[in-house]
Structure formats: structure tokens, C-alpha cells
Design a protein with these regions (language model features):
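Short catalytic micro-motifs in class I SAM-dependent methyltransferases
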Residues: 131-135
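Class I (Rossmann-like) S-adenosyl-L-methionine-dependent methyltransferase catalytic domain
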Residues: 1-120, 136-147, 151, 157-236
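Conserved acidic residues
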Residues: 125
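A conserved beta-strand element that flanks and buttresses the S-adenosyl-L-methionine
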Residues: 128
């Protein structure tokens, strides 16, 4: 008989993980068809990320990208002279990212694993998340914050984009409560956040900027969708 006794907090987290849709096979299937009409499949960086670099809000140094997917932001950062480590649990996404990096002749340390299994020796000057947070279930949110705090240097910056609550775009995330996730055992495509909730979640960080992402009409050399938040925080 399978032993399903819960002994530790980690056992509880893994049990809750198992009751939600498995993330790895979903994202492998998602990235397997590279011809799909998905805006962020284009090999272009987020407009807010470009603004951080151009305005020198973030100085060159060591960068960790969480949920890098096919690598578009990691490649941009490497091209700008950053030392980039990029993590994603999808083998399909990482393979695509490696091919793109090779084509662009940039060096990036790619890691194919869950961000919650990450074990690296470095501390980072900048951590970036483009669309990972809103796919993380509430019971893992504290682990996510702990991960950022562990790997981000004091005075370092953390940037993200995520679904914005209140936007009616059909591609936006769901506005269910944290409890509702477990009533229905689903994130319903991803969780939308209000500005107030972002400020509360990251209350231990200094808020540098929270704004809607600028809509970038394609074709373009930057990605931008106005149903997303962009945020930049500084570790105190």
C-alpha cells in the first residue's frame, strides 16, 4: 500500500502540487508546436525590461530569469552584456531557448528544472520573471518569495510581468481567490493580480515602479501587452 502519510510541511506542499494540473507536461506540449500564434513566441524582449536597461535602472551584472520559456528575455540580457542564468521546467522550452541562443551567439546558463528545485551558488544583481508568478499556485507563493530573497543581493532588483486584475482582455488570467483555487483544484489558466495584492505580496521590497505594460503593435522589436502588469522592486 502506498504510504501517503504527511510528516512535514514539504509533504503538504507536494500533496497540494499533485492535486493540480501537472505543470511540466502542459508546458512541454505548449512549446512543442513553435508555429502557434502566440505573441510571446516572438524572439523579442519585454518593453519594460528594455526600459529598465536603457534608463540604467538595472546595471550590468548577474541575472536570474525565472520561467524563461524559449529564452527571448534571457537572450536580450545576454546580448546587453549580462551574465545570465535562465530556468524553466519545460525541456521543450529550454531546447528552443538553447537553439535561439546559439543562433544569436550568446552564452547563457540554462537550467531545466522547477524553480523550486533551484540550487546555485550565486547571488544575483537582478532577478526577472516574465509570466511565471501568475502560474504559481498560492501554496507555493511563499516559496517563491523565499527564493527571490535567497538569491537576490541586498540592493538588487526584481522585475516581473503578470496578469492584471480588472482587465477584460480574454487572454487575461482568472480573478478567483486563493481559496477558490483549491475549491476547484485549478488556477483557471493563471491568476490575475491587483496592484494592491502585488504590493502586499512584495511588501518587504521597495517599490520602484508598478504600471501596465505598454501595448506594442507587431511586428516590433519589443513585446508588450496592456493586460499585463509590469513591476520593478528593490531588495532593502
Amino acid at each position: 500500500m502506498k504510504n501517503e502519510t504527511l510528516h512535514t510541511q514539504e509533504d503538504i506542499l507536494k500533496m497540494l502540487d499533485s492535486l493540480l494540473r501537472p505543470a511540466e507536461p502542459f508546458w512541454n506540449e505548449f512549446y512543442a508546436n513553435r508555429e502557434k500564434d502566440v505573441p510571446f513566441f516572438e524572439n523579442i524582449p519585454d518593453e519594460n525590461l528594455v526600459s529598465y536597461i536603457q534608463k540604467e535602472r538595472v546595471s550590468k551584472g548577474k541575472v536570474l530569469e525565472l520561467g524563461c520559456g524559449p529564452g527571448r528575455n534571457a537572450i536580450y540580457l545576454a546580448n546587453e552584456g549580462f551574465d545570465v542564468t535562465a530556468v524553466d521546467l519545460s525541456a521543450e522550452g529550454i531546447q528552443w531557448a538553447k537553439e535561439r541562443a546559439l543562433a544569436k551567439r550568446v552564452q547563457i546558463h540554462f537550467i531545466c528544472d522547477s524553480i523550486f528545485n533551484l540550487e546555485v551558488q550565486n547571488e544575483f544583481d537582478f532577478i526577472y520573471d516574465s509570466g511565471c508568478l501568475h502560474h504559481i499556485p498560492p501554496h507555493r507563493r511563499m516559496n517563491y518569495i523565499e527564493l527571490i530573497d535567497r538569491y537576490l543581493k541586498s540592493g538588487g532588483y526584481f522585475g516581473l510581468t503578470c496578469f492584471a486584475a480588472g482587465d477584460l482582455d480574454e487572454r487575461n488570467g482568472s480573478e478567483i481567490t486563493d481559496w477558490d483555487v483549491y475549491r476547484g483544484w485549478s488556477l483557471q489558466g493563471g491568476l490575475a493580480y491587483s496592484e494592491e495584492k502585488l504590493r502586499e505580496i512584495f511588501k518587504e521590497f521597495e517599490v520602484i515602479e508598478i504600471r501596465k505594460m505598454k501595448q506594442m503593435k507587431q511586428p516590433n522589436d519589443m513585446f508588450g501587452e496592456s493586460f499585463l502588469w509590469t513591476a520593478l522592486f528593490k531588495k532593502k
